[in-house]
């Protein structure tokens, strides 16, 4: 797998222009086990011999031949001996030669040998800390000649004159060390009882969980001449390479990944892995939100087409549009979008799985679960099953995509008419049925009710802001795409009679915690994108811009590149409107002549944090399997102590989310502050590359990052 990936990168490197070759490091993990010749034993020791890693278990040694491990003559386990250490030094844990002197790490201290029988205790200190180190289990010398220690108190670097000490406050994630090794260009790797840590330019990269290693308990590690680190654990060997790659090469990789393993009849969705963690064992899967996921992929390809003029991008955007339209055309009533379409002979008996008994079981724990059967009705032609009980998630995705497609991709009359037709059908369905999705049982779907009656009831009060805003957004998209004035007239009625625009100013619940679900951030921001982009009334634009800011203040530190891109794109438009002078207080809220100028100036100052977009795009792993990652043990985090907050929520000491490659999120609608998380499907599912593609191309389109 690793060799195939490296060949893929080589082929990519000759396919892009020089302006596209701004490179960054992409970490890639390979797990070695019985398939490549290793026994199922703990890997205890590692050395580099002739630039090849050689490992030892308790009874055997193996050398890497490039494709397989070969049993070789037993290499004795490394033993360290330091004579005449002070009696109170405790157990000798590590040892290294520093400037021609032996440095010994012990359970009770750090020592340097000044003469044959003379050991002096080292007490590291800098401007922040003064240590008497304990359990100094890791020592190494980097390529610049610095001494590094890993101790109970943290990590230290000594240049021969001064110390620099690192704890959780400086970003050190963990401190139960087992080993250390020097890499290239001053890089240092530490092994711990919970993963491996790379220190590069005083920044700590934490590599733990099955995403990076076969097991978290690292016994030993070593770095070869290319900078590859080989990591011995209790359950096999891990290998991590840092390879140079460009953003465009990464986009090409994820487009291919999505097309190869996630395209089912034009629908994009997570797949299923018959063998856990083995992407080659995939089979195409379905989700509850095929329409939303296909829409988001189509939006990514639309932005790609706008940025690059790539013919493939237009082809994929068109295919996505046709797939989304098919979801709408196949159902019982015009304009009702299905969640999923599958062949009548699909491998799973879905209506037996989603039986009446299934519904009753769900209602015991969820009183709002809808009892509808069949959940997969048969299409009129008898060839397909389609999933009902469609949610607001689907509609948010559909309308988000349709507006973007219409603006950036639709060029021919046929393309324009196709998107006009599907927007008209869905919007007319909502209006005709009292602003709700009416299912085949004649009732509203569980999550598809945008009616005034629902929004102003005990059942919908917590969704009032979001659903009111979404309905106005749908109508704005419909007005823009179709040009039919009836949709603006309908929106005006909802505003004047039911205050939907006032509700929209608080479009997302962020407290109490029990009302907070992260995917509503997607619904909110995707709908605000259509609402604000197509709104013509300056007073409403000011109100909706305030709603956007409220949402942003609650999510801005989660390092979600997609959310940053939406916020940045909408703020750009607002600032342009301010420059055009459309918020003239003579006409905009004239009852308070100070309000419009004040809000215009306030909301013209914005920061979508392009640095967070770039960091996240760089660090999104190429492996999108849903590994469980538990960060609650880290030294560099703070737990969210908000009353009512569920366990396992928090952020790093800098108040921002843990980097994306150190948490379990591989979808765009997850909570970046979830320190303990396993993606849906876990190791038995791979997520699609839209996770990278949509924020990347959207950020490029809005000039939030440069190619």
Name the predicted role of every residue range.
Residues 58-62, 107-111, 152-156, 193-197, ...:
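Loop/turn residues immediately N-terminal
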Residues 30-49, 73-98, 123-144, 167-184, ...:
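Short coil-to-beta transitions that initiate beta-strands within beta-rich domains
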Residues 295-310, 382, 397-414, 460, ...:
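Well-ordered alpha-helical scaffold segments within catalytic/enzyme domains
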